[in-house]
Amino acid sequence: MENVCGWIAQAGSAPQGARLSSAQKADWLVIGAGITGLSAAHTLAALHPQARIIVVDRQRAAQGASARNSGFVVAHEHPAHSELIGEPGFAGFEVDTAISRAASDEVRQRIARHAIDCDFRDSGYYFAVNDRAKLDHVDAKLATLRALGARAEFLQGAALAQKLGTRHYQAAIWCGQGNALLQPAKYVKGLLNALPGSITLYEDTDISGLERLSHGRLRANSVDGSIEAKQVLVCLNAFVPRVGIADTATFPMELSASLTRPLTEQEFQAIGAVEPWGVLSTRPLGATVRLTPDRRVMIRNTAEYRTRDLSNGELTLRRQHHVRGLQRRFPFLGESDIQYTWTGHLSASRSGQAYFDRVEEGVFAVAGCNGSGVARGTLWGRLLAELASGIDSPLLQSVMHRAEPGWLPPRPLFDIGAMLRMRVEAVRARTEI
């Protein structure tokens, strides 16, 4: 089957950018034209209006992982037991929430500044479960979320079904005041289209490595060209190692999702003509589900650590998993109702924290979105550009202080451990797919 992202297909085509085919020089080079890289490029252009800035991507700009995620703008995450008020992890959770709220605000500011039409809905979303046991300590979670500025409500049974149009979910915490939904491909395409004319973009340009030249500048090499720059920002998240930065303590995960055709008017009325919504599971491998403004259902219920990308045949099997998840929620939907199925990647870490650092003189990198790439990627791009420009702030200090992704064992031990952990989590989440 064909791997086609429904978000990208709906965002519409864009003119093909040039491919690097010569030696170029720049003041700034940004590697990666996703949310983080484009946010960084916008910030650099504002801070250094006379500088020459080049952005490169190994594929079409704004069509990588940033366009393929589920479109959740995360300001408030579901707190673990150790992060509740009165528990040892609350102080760290409080700092992380302040960062996430700033990131959510950054998304809103970008959308307003560049007039990006991306189906943005500032309506919150749900942490919902089929198995009531997987949503515990409800009162403490509500108190924790509210103490950190969220609006949070507990729903169950008929009241929840009335909101979602399905009786699959038995209990949920709705969380707003910063949490939002958008169409990710439209958002990142909007960032791309708003780049100032002073920025040069090269697409389909795979940077294979960085080398330090004798006079201190850096050269990024591709098959048919090179770019010499004073400063380099590496915004590749899961794929930072491709340019030779190996020690980020982060790792890639491959996810798959499907998007249905729009519901018919009869189907829409049958589920109660509900407002668009988004659901995140309380389990790491539980399903992420959305009902979009154009009445489609999106489901993402596979996440894997792999040493190679899924083949089309393997994606067909994942699509069957999507079908089972759809039919648990909306029995009238089957495989023939799926219009798009695709894969995407995220960058994860053992601790859930990012890698955000000055790698060496003139080289700055970020990785480890841990599933919150829309908001955090937007903020990280700005802060990475500010760090590289010598601009400090309390927010930047908070991000750098929390940027401890944790130690990973060497391969192949890590490969074995990660795959076993994924299997265990899949079993734990079996009621939530």
Please name every model-derived segment.
Residues 1-28, 46-47, 51-52:
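Extreme N-terminal leader/targeting segments of oxidoreductases
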Residues 2-10, 79-85, 109-190:
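Flavin (FAD/FMN) cofactor-binding and adjacent substrate-gating region
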Residues 45-68:
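Glycine-rich FAD pyrophosphate-binding loop
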Residues 64, 68-99:
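Glycine-rich active-site loop/strand segments that organize a redox cofactor
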Residues 305-426, 430:
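C-terminal catalytic lobe of FAD-dependent flavoproteins
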